[in-house]
């Protein structure tokens, strides 16, 4: 996606969020469109998470930078990209990062597609296991849309976020970094997307700056349950 389209998409998303805020909560019955991460506030840890990947080039760059810094992250990947780039998924796994489900085709849960959404989760779990040999229990539902009934039905734990620097609609790495470092606090979950060069640059700079400030980067399972 080029910069112009990314900016337009970002503006549209912000307008939609503003409309929702003005008219009040949208009720989809048992569907939750937003959520809050529940975290332990007793340690100075943060989790860096990446959605939508892997990317054939930028994810490799990111993995190299994280390995150089001895930092572990969490990657919520789509089933389509697992099938397209299994060798990168294997590298993510072998490097010690946590892998989570992001549906097969980045499908958002709505009031009318619950069965399709569920099948995308199941299919993605299957293709991830084919590559890593391990089951996946963490999911980041696209756009934060989730149905609590799926947690027991599919044995999946949803992971949302506390900081979103909107890296996917920016070509300004320094601005992305600033959006994170001025807001971050212990136990935050940072949302980013490993599909863009600017994200890789920004993510590694975020790691460098927050490490100097005494933060420890952990995977989301460590943050939520250790």
Give residue ranges: language-model regions.
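Active-site beta->alpha N-cap acidic-glycine motif
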Residues: 26-112, 116-117, 123, 127, ...
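Catalytic domains of cell-wall/extracellular-matrix polysaccharide-remodeling enzymes
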Residues: 107-216, 221-226
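Terminal accessory/targeting
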Residues: 1-48, 64-73, 185-226
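Weak global preference for isoleucine
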Residues: 7-15, 19, 23, 31, ...
């Amino acid at each position: 996606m080029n910069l112009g389209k990314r900016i337009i998409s970002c503006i549209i998303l912000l307008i939609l969020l503003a409309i929702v805020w003005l008219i009040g909560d949208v009720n989809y019955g048992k569907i939750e469109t937003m959520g809050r991460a529940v975290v332990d506030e007793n340690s100075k840890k943060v989790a860096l998470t990446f959605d939508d990947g892997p990317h054939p080039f930028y994810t490799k760059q990111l993995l190299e930078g994280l390995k150089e810094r001895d930092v572990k992250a969490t990657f919520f990947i789509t089933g389509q990209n697992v099938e397209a780039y299994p060798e990168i998924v294997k590298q993510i796994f072998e490097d010690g990062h946590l892998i989570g489900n992001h549906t097969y085709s980045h499908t958002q849960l709505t009031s009318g597609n619950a069965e399709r959404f569920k099948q995308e989760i199941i299919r993605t779990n299957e293709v991830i296991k084919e590559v890593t040999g391990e089951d996946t229990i963490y999911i980041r539902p696209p756009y934060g849309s989730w149905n609590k009934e799926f947690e027991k039905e599919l044995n999946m734990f949803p992971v949302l976020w506390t900081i979103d620097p909107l890296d996917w609609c920016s070509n300004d790495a320094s601005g992305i970094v600033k959006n994170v470092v001025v807001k971050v606090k212990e136990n935050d979950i940072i949302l980013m997307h490993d599909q863009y060069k600017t994200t890789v640059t920004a993510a590694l700079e975020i790691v460098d700056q927050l490490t100097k400030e005494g933060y420890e980067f952990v995977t989301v399972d460590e943050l939520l349950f250790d």
